């Protein structure tokens, strides 16, 4: 299973990808066997969704209108599935900001 870190590293890599490939790469599946579903309230799921989006949005521009987060259960496994369509990566802007901050310190 690909970790979130692996996914972000792939997305921020030098290779370019089509929108569909990026969409597939950003489909995060966080699964755990025997999850106590009663503890996953609507408020908790909303908070998780917001936190996931906040972290991913630091690295890529997300199409927030197309974001889909859901819980899927199959057999004895429950998965939190997040489909986060990417508009573009923000690596250039991040590097620019780092350079700008470095210049200010001099």
From Swiss-Prot:
It holds the Pfam family MinE. The keyword DNA damage does not apply. It comes from the Bacteria. GO terms for biological process: cell division; regulation of division septum assembly. SUPFAM superfamilies: Cell division protein MinE topological specificity domain. The keyword Cell cycle applies. Prevents the cell division inhibition by proteins MinC and MinD at internal division sites while permitting inhibition at polar sites. This ensures cell division at the proper site by restricting the formation of a division septum at the midpoint of the long axis of the cell. HAMAP family: MinE. This is Cell division topological specificity factor.
């Amino acid at each position: 299973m690909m970790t979130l870190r692996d996914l972000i590293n792939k997305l921020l890599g030098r290779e370019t990808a089509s929108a569909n490939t990026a969409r597939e790469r950003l489909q995060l599946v966080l699964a755990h066997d025997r999850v106590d579903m009663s503890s996953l309230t609507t408020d908790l799921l909303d908070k998780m969704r917001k936190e996931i989006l906040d972290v991913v949005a630091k690295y890529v521009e997300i199409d927030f209108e197309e974001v889909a987060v859901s819980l899927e259960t199959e057999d004895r496994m429950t998965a939190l599935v997040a489909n986060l369509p990417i508009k573009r990566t923000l690596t250039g802007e991040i590097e620019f900001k780092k350079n700008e901050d470095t210049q200010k310190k001099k």
